[in-house]
Amino acid sequence: MLDKGEYSFSTCWNIKKHTIGRDMIEEIKELGFRQVELNYNVTEEMMKTIEPMIEKGEIGVSSVHNVFPFIDDKDYDTDSVMLGFDDEVKRKRSVELLIRSMEYANRYGAKAVVVHPGEVPFEYNIDLDLKKLYRDHGKDSPEYQKLWKDMSERRERLSPLYTKRIQDSLEEVSEHAAKQGWSVAIGIETRSRSYQMPTLMEAKTICENLKGGPVYLWYDIGHAMMMDRMGLYDNLKELQEVKRYIYGVHIHETLELSDHWCSYVHSKDLQYFDHFLEAIDFAKVKVYELKAVCQPDEIDESHKLITSKIAAMKG
């Protein structure tokens, strides 16, 4: 397999089929990757066989994904109010968990922690209903537009409150990291549900207000494509505004509203993803975040297309 150089690869691709950490990492190494992103499902048990690999230099860690290692608590899972909790005890716990993830990142020599910072809470997963209406009736249908209006009115009304609270939490974490002398970036990730935070402009606000600290945008390309399709923001236009805040990227493509596919290969569109090549090139950490059905030859082909196109773009 082609040596993937500076590009890293998320363990989300094969974590469900492994119980032994070393086996999971070896399979990723066989794809030609020298670095991995340890995602939030990696357990302490799995790390017992991965840590010796890190120590011996058999694998590098580009990034870890908060909450890391895995904790079995729905309040702090991947779809949570997290750093924006109204409940101060829960908010403090979220801060502590992010600090814990940063400790591990620092120990493993990782450059960044990827974090889902929060959301505007709803009583139920309204995004699930929106996606169903989008698929069944289309974005321009009255059914979709009505529910979208209901969602976005609440989201816009409460966004400043949750943006500020997330920002305050990130400031606490940043201050702790500075005292520890950690050189680890915190990447706030673009999300896959319309009520989740941040949008690109919310990320810009947070990054600007915490300028000089370790907080950056983690640009998840496939998620941003999906949010653009649903109508949350103008991805291509706003990307130009936020590009300078990007620290890392999650590389994958979204087909309709289905994410984590190999760029170019599964969409069979050899042009549209070109819009994101500058962001990939600019990012200090470049991570493929792919679903299990992506095959090694497809991953290879996608990587060749991305890297050759970037090389051509740079002349």
Indicate residue ranges for each PLM-predicted region.
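Active-site acidic/histidine proton-transfer and metal-coordination neighborhood
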Residues: L83-Y216
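Short amphipathic alpha-helical segments, especially helix-boundary/capping motifs
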Residues: M1-L2, M24-I28, D75-D79, K146-M151, ...
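Histidine-acidic metal/acid-base catalytic patches
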Residues: M1-T11, T19-E27, E44, E55-G57, ...
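Short, charged helix-to-loop "capping" segments that act as catalytic/coupling loops
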Residues: D72-Y76, K179-W182, S192-Q196, D228-L232
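Conserved beta-strand edge residues that scaffold enzyme active sites
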Residues: V42-T43, F68, E119-V120, R193, ...
